[in-house]
Design a protein with these regions (language model features):
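A short alpha-helical element within helix-turn-helix/winged-helix DNA-binding domains
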Residues: 31-41
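Short coil turns linking two alpha-helices in DNA-binding domains
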Residues: 43-46
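Short amphipathic alpha-helical interface segments
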Residues: 18-27
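Short, intrinsically disordered or compositionally biased N-terminal tails of bacterial proteins
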Residues: 1-6
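Beta-hairpin "wing" of winged helix-turn-helix
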Residues: 57-66, 70-72
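Non-DNA-binding regulatory cores of transcription-related proteins
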Residues: 74-144
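Basic amphipathic alpha-helical segments that dock to polyanions
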Residues: 51-55
Length: 144
């Protein structure tokens, strides 16, 4: 199990989990926010908010009431980066800086100059890698 300390919010994994449920159960169940919440282990309100984000990103269709959700795009065409963006993760900084480095200190005064571009490079590397991974790849690993 991954125990990293980076700042990607749980929204990304909730979004992936949501899309996997929609695809995996599409032929057997009406995949509603309550149904998905039972798999994810969160309140259905959190799933409804995520479904709205995924809908706004044109990844899912959600039928009003208890109509359920369905993918608008095949899983092999949905990249993890698409999901990352839809979940709003690209709007947040991957790495959060401590708030008050001492500007009078030779380290604290230059820490941003020394580290910011490296953090941007790491963020770009992650995003580039996410673009190569598809929801269908994750789907296949569920069956292992």
């Amino acid at each position: 199990m991954y125990n990293g300390r980076m700042q990607i919010s749980r929204d990304f994994t909730i979004a992936v989990h949501t899309l996997l449920c929609i695809e995996y159960f599409k032929n057997d169940y009406k995949v509603t926010s309550d149904f998905i919440a039972g798999s994810v282990g969160v309140n259905p309100v959190i799933i409804r908010r995520m479904l709205l984000r995924l809908k706004n990103a044109n990844l899912v269709e959600v039928k009003a009431g208890t109509g359920g959700a369905s993918l608008l795009i095949p899983p092999e065409k949905i990249s993890l980066y698409d999901i990352y963006k839809a979940a709003g993760c690209d709007e947040k900084q991957l790495f959060n800086f401590h708030e008050n480095p001492n500007s009078k200190c030779p380290v604290g005064g230059h820490i941003h100059n020394a580290l910011d571009f490296r953090l941007e490079l790491l963020t770009q590397t992650l995003e580039d890698k996410l673009k190569t991974m598809k929801l269908s790849d994750v789907m296949k690993d569920l069956e292992k």
